[in-house]
Each structure stands twice: as C-alpha cells, then as structure tokens.
Amino acid sequence: MEKRLLDFEVGETVELFLLIKSSIKGTASNGKPFLSLVLQDKSGELEAKLWDVKESDEVNYGVQQIVHLIGDIQNYRGRKQLKIRQIRQATPLDGVNASEFMETAPINKEEMADEITQYIFEMKNANLQRITRALLKKYQDDFYDYPAAMRHHHEFVSGLSFHVVSMLRLAKAVSDLYPTVNRDLLYAGVILHDLGKVIELSGPVSTTYTLEGNLIGHISIVVEEVSKIADELSIDDEEVVVLKHVLLSHHGKGEWGSPKPPLVREAEILHQIDLMDASINMMDKVLKHTKPGEFSERVFGLDNRSFYNPTFE
C-alpha cells in the first residue's frame, strides 16, 4: 500500500502530491520572506516552511493549490514537520484533483443523516423536537459537509456531523444509564451545539474563520438562531431558555468560550461528552501513527501532552 503523508517517520524522505491547506507569508530573522504551509492528504496534515520565497511563489503555493514535493520529515519541538527540498505546482498532466487529498468522515453523509433523524424522531418533547428539526433542515447541506473545527479535532470534510453522531451515541448511553437525564434536552443540545460552525467557518476546504466567526463566534450564533426559530414557531416556553443555556455553556468555562458555566444537569453532560469525543479524536489521530512502545508527537489541544501507545492489546 502506498504510504501517505503521516505514515512517514522522522528521518524519512517524502515524495508526494499534497494539497496546500493554508499558506501564510512571514519574514525570517535575516529579513527574507518565507511561507508557512500546512500540507495535507487523506491521512492528515503537516506544517512546512518554504524559505527565500519570491512574489511568484506566493501565487503558485497559495491555498488549495496541489503541489508535488520532495522533502524530509523532521522533529520540531516534539512534532513532525516537513522540510521542503523541491516543490512545484501540479499540472493537468499529473492527473490529480483536490478531492484525492481531503480527509473525510469514516461514515458517509447519508448514513449520518439517517442516524441523526432517528434520534430526532425519538424526542418526545414537541417544542425541543420542532426547534431541532427546523434548524437542522435550515442548514442541513452545510451541516453534513463542514468540519467541526479549523484545527485540532474533527477538522475534516463532514467532521461536524460525524462529531454529532458520535456524541449522540454517548448521549444515548448516558441517558440509558441515568434515567434522571432529560434525553430530549440532551439530544437537542448535542445536535445543535456546534451548528453555528456553518456560519463561523468558511467551508470544508481550506477552512478559515468568517467575519461572523471572528466577531461573534459559533456559540452566540447558534443561540441567536434558536431565538429566531422559536419566534417563527411561536414557542416561548421554558424549553427555549433552558436549551439556550445548554448551548451557551457547552464549553464549560468562561476562559474556554462559554459566558455561563453549566447550571443544568444536561448542560454539564453535554460539556463532558463534547470534551470526551474531541479528546478521543485528537488522541486517535496521533496514536494511529505511533508505533507500540513509543510516545506520540505532542498534541497542542490536549495541553501539549505526548501519549504512549502500549505494546499489548
């Protein structure tokens, strides 16, 4: 099987076609310009530096360009980085296209849509069900295409809906174990908690923050959407206030982006399973490329820790 970008070990030489996910110009200590690149294929992404760049390089090696490169995998502060030796733009004769390099969710969109719809049908509270169905219908095309984040966790095509499906499975397990949990409120919170990402982020390819994302953020965006849809549906019961609290507090702490801490049982559960699913996704991503008996590269989103891959099963 042909090796992909993250299959290469430190010290190995890479010769691959890759997609440029991001390209940022900087100035080195010697005053010469360089490009900080994030390069990706279906296995994931790595950072790279292109030194002593010319103006034409900024155009040739911009976002969404496919390139052919030769380089070396190095260790930089506990993480793999690619040192570029040769690079060129791909041409039509190379026969490659962007979709070949984009990581996607391990479940297809149709399966995820069917599963999420089933959870909505299980909801018995009419107000929560109507709000959830209406918002999902409004944004369903983007919801099933967008990543869950720019970096760190579920940052791939359909990552948002895959994150929600995983969390719904966790929510069901928690609700089955603890009968005091309001299953409908928890399900609604899970499905809607990151829906604002479809406005906060630019899309599934070369994702950046939109103006709304930079100035407002996905939490405030989705709470505003809930308020608007509740008005349209003439729902002004307590469910609206409590659902908005669950969404506002799902990051858990003010320093993590939530204006309120969780003050409802289901809000705390949502925060915990969101954190769990994101953390496991980040660990799985690095441990998949870590040999048994070795430590992974550092994971910035998990306090810059390295994780050990045990030798036993």
Curated annotation (Swiss-Prot):
Pfam families: HD. Keywords: Exonuclease, Hydrolase, Nuclease. Disulfide bonds: none annotated. CDD domains: HDc (cd00077), YhaM_OBF_like (cd04492). Its EC number is 3.1.-.-. Signal peptide: none annotated. PROSITE patterns: HD. GO terms for biological process: rRNA 3'-end processing. Residues 163-279 form the HD domain. GO terms for molecular function: 3'-5'-RNA exonuclease activity. The keyword Methyltransferase does not apply. Shows a 3'-5' exoribonuclease activity. Belongs to the YhaM family. This is 3'-5' exoribonuclease YhaM. It comes from Listeria welshimeri serovar 6b (strain ATCC 35897 / DSM 20650 / CCUG 15529 / CIP 8149 / NCTC 11857 / SLCC 5334 / V8). The gene is yhaM.
